[in-house]
Amino acid sequence: MDYFPMIFALLFVAFQGAPEAAVLGTELSTGAESGGERPVPTTPWRPRRSKRCSCSSLMDKECVYFCHLDIIWVNTPEHVVPYGLGSPSRSKRSLKDFFPTKATVHRKRCQCASQTDKKCQNFCQAGKELKDQDSMEKAWDNRKRGKDCPKLGEKCLQQQLVVGRKTRRLETISNSIKTSFRVAKLKAQLYRDKKVIYSRAH
């Protein structure tokens, strides 16, 4: 059996399919066509993440769940975590973002991508109002506690520390419960919307 034609064909295919040769060939052909000018290199296309709004803090899980539409939420034994937040494309920031003024200290919970999206506007505004209300309640509680202390002295301060720890723990628990209820509500609403769209399609 003669293997020479098969080996020759394989070598021919290997040398013709070499990437260096192919690249060199394209460079020569484009150079000849354009008269020696180099072609402008094109940047690779990057898919943009679909965002309804951008949160002021990624620690606010409810806001992240509401705003980032393409995040897959993964259930872990401890908590629900977002998957797919890595390197979201964002516009360049101005110097105002790096040096916040007094006017921007009380900013919204999030910033909507579309100004006509009423649901988003309500969500971002409601979050800001809730935060303001919580901070006002905390300040009022602290003021009430401070009135009783001058009478009792050191014992009062120790009691305040214990009460402060307990209240912080209770606040953390209540906040996590509120967040989980809100997330469950949003998930149920999302599921209902998908069901309606699916039933209309079929």
Curated annotation (Swiss-Prot):
<dbReference type="GO" id="GO:0086100">
    <property type="term" value="P:endothelin receptor signaling pathway"/>
</dbReference>
<comment type="similarity">
    <text>Belongs to the endothelin/sarafotoxin family.</text>
</comment>
<feature type="region of interest" description="Endothelin-like">
    <location>
        <begin position="110"/>
        <end position="124"/>
    </location>
</feature>
<dbReference type="GO" id="GO:0003100">
    <property type="term" value="P:regulation of systemic arterial blood pressure by endothelin"/>
</dbReference>
<feature type="disulfide bond">
    <location>
        <begin position="55"/>
        <end position="63"/>
    </location>
</feature>
<keyword id="KW-0732">Signal</keyword>
<dbReference type="GO" id="GO:0031707">
    <property type="term" value="F:endothelin A receptor binding"/>
</dbReference>
<comment type="function">
    <text>Endothelins are endothelium-derived vasoconstrictor peptides. Probable ligand for G-protein coupled receptors EDNRA and EDNRB which activates PTK2B, BCAR1, BCAR3 and, GTPases RAP1 and RHOA cascade in glomerular mesangial cells. Also binds the DEAR/FBXW7-AS1 receptor. Promotes mesenteric arterial wall remodeling via activation of ROCK signaling and subsequent colocalization of NFATC3 with F-actin filaments. NFATC3 then translocates to the nucleus where it subsequently promotes the transcription of the smooth muscle hypertrophy and differentiation marker ACTA2.</text>
</comment>
<protein>
    <recommendedName>
        <fullName>Endothelin-1</fullName>
    </recommendedName>
</protein>
<dbReference type="GO" id="GO:1900182">
    <property type="term" value="P:positive regulation of protein localization to nucleus"/>
</dbReference>
<dbReference type="GO" id="GO:0005615">
    <property type="term" value="C:extracellular space"/>
</dbReference>
<dbReference type="InterPro" id="IPR020475">
    <property type="entry name" value="Endothelin"/>
</dbReference>
<keyword id="KW-0165">Cleavage on pair of basic residues</keyword>
<dbReference type="GO" id="GO:0014826">
    <property type="term" value="P:vein smooth muscle contraction"/>
</dbReference>
<feature type="propeptide">
    <location>
        <begin position="26"/>
        <end position="50"/>
    </location>
</feature>
<feature type="disulfide bond">
    <location>
        <begin position="53"/>
        <end position="67"/>
    </location>
</feature>
<keyword id="KW-0839">Vasoconstrictor</keyword>
<dbReference type="GO" id="GO:0031708">
    <property type="term" value="F:endothelin B receptor binding"/>
</dbReference>
<dbReference type="GO" id="GO:0019229">
    <property type="term" value="P:regulation of vasoconstriction"/>
</dbReference>
<dbReference type="InterPro" id="IPR019764">
    <property type="entry name" value="Endothelin_toxin_CS"/>
</dbReference>
<dbReference type="InterPro" id="IPR001928">
    <property type="entry name" value="Endothln-like_toxin"/>
</dbReference>
<dbReference type="GO" id="GO:0005179">
    <property type="term" value="F:hormone activity"/>
</dbReference>
<keyword id="KW-0964">Secreted</keyword>
<dbReference type="Pfam" id="PF00322">
    <property type="entry name" value="Endothelin"/>
</dbReference>
<feature type="region of interest" description="Disordered">
    <location>
        <begin position="29"/>
        <end position="48"/>
    </location>
</feature>
<dbReference type="GO" id="GO:0006874">
    <property type="term" value="P:intracellular calcium ion homeostasis"/>
</dbReference>
<feature type="signal peptide">
    <location>
        <begin position="1"/>
        <end position="25"/>
    </location>
</feature>
<feature type="propeptide">
    <location>
        <begin position="74"/>
        <end position="202"/>
    </location>
</feature>
<keyword id="KW-1015">Disulfide bond</keyword>
<feature type="site" description="Cleavage; by KEL">
    <location>
        <begin position="73"/>
        <end position="74"/>
    </location>
</feature>
<keyword id="KW-0838">Vasoactive</keyword>
